[in-house]
Amino acid sequence: MKKIAIAAAALFAFSGTAHAQMVRAQDPSSVARALQGAGYKAEMTKDDTGDPLIRSTSSGSNFAIFFFGCTKNVDCRTIQFFAGYDRDKSPSLSQMNDWNSKKRFGRAYLSDKGAARIEMDVDLDDGGISTKLFEDNLEFWVLLMAQFEKHIDS
């Protein structure tokens, strides 16, 4: 009986630790901590509707992490990495279509004013994702941004 109690206590302790290491949209600070843990700045703020928003930078390029599926500005379900580029010369619609037809991730489009935009959604609902998986998505996002910048500048 004593062994069962010890095993149960260990299981609960492990599950609490594992849960604490999850990156969850319901806990925007967990997203900020994961971003900082990967070596990026994380400026916590709010968007125009009051939902959480994190601003960051990679290699001199600004990006944001928007939170979606929020209930009254809390309990969010998903995040979206976003970067916008206002260049002297707007990329063509053909360039955007070329990107979207060749890239599985990183949806690209032009704003109403002709500025290039790229987004990547990450589902953090139902318990979130591990810090390691978040870092993997972050690395992929940073790579996509660099590739996209080359694409729109070509």
Identify the meaning behind each predicted range.
Residues 4-15:
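Sec-dependent N-terminal signal peptides
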Residues 146-154:
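Flexible helix-coil linker/hinge segments at domain or subdomain boundaries
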Residues 28, 32-35, 93, 135-138, ...:
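Extracytoplasmic/secreted envelope proteins and their assembly/folding machinery
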